[in-house]
Structures are given as structure tokens and as C-alpha cells.
Amino acid sequence: MITKIHTIFNMSLIKTSEEIELIRESAQLVSKTLGMLASEIKPGINTLYLDNLAESFIRDHKGVPGFLGLYDFPNTLCISPNSQVVHGIPNKEIIKEGQILSIDCGVLKNGYYGDHAFTFTVGEVDKEILQLLEITKQSLYVGIEQFKLGNRVGDVGYAIQNYNESKGYGVVRELVGHGLGKE
């Protein structure tokens, strides 16, 4: 516990423009990795296959998988099918038509991390799932609108929560949010 608190107080919360550019380069590799995976996601494959593709792609582009070995995590990606919230471990279970896969990817490149997630559909999915995906996508844009001078991260979260609740959905309150940088 004390080590974690010590780490938090030693983190630089405000980044220089040079640091932001290095984080951007890592994040761009994350985006390219997720984009590459999009064409590979289909019924009949397993998530371990996607994980292996991602690791090779990241390394081929001079990055290091950001999650692999972090807190003993055994894989490159966190892949959470259907209603699993986060941090799913890739395995040999076969992906089926109608599922959704939340894929979280992190990359370390040039000493800085990039990290984001995207939810993919596997073939045709139920109308209710498509509605959920559209509402969560719109809530992202509602949150982005709150990133302005004088606002705090809590203002962003508040806007997202209010939007989702106005549409009959809630928000996950655990395992959400972290900084980016060298750690």
C-alpha cells in the first residue's frame, strides 16, 4: 500500500508537449493494433489467436505489449466477451456469432504508454446490444465535450453518467480510469 501511494505522489500528472507526443505515438500504435484486429474478429476463432496477432503486430512496429507481465498478467490483450466488464484473459474458447468483445490494448513505446479499448461485434448482434453500443458511444462524445478549461475529470464522468442514466443504463463504478505516462 505504501509503495503504491509513494508511486502515485511521484507521478507527473501534468505532461510536457514532448511527453504528450510520445504518449500519442504509443496510443497510435494501440489504435493501429485494434484496427488490424477488427478484420480478424469472426466466429470460429479464439481470443488467444487475437492476442498472438496483437503481440506480433506491436513488436513488429517497435513497441512492447504494455500489459504482458504487468502485475503478472499473462497476455498482451485484455479481452472481455459479452457482459464481462474488464480484464478478461485470452483463451482457447471459440468466439461465436452474436457476441461482443471488449478488447483493451496497451503499448509501451519510446518509454511511454498508450492504452485504450474498443468493443467489437462478432457478426450480427441483437438490436438491444447495438442500442447499448450506440448509447455508450454517444456518452463518450458527451464526456469529451466536458474537456475544457476549468473543468475537472469529475465533470467528464458526471456528464457520461447522467447521459447513460437518462437512457436507462448505468455505469461501472469500479476499475475505471488511470493516468498515462511512463508507468
Predicted regions and their residues:
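Active-site neighborhoods and metal-handling regions in enzymes and metal-associated proteins
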Residues: 2-183
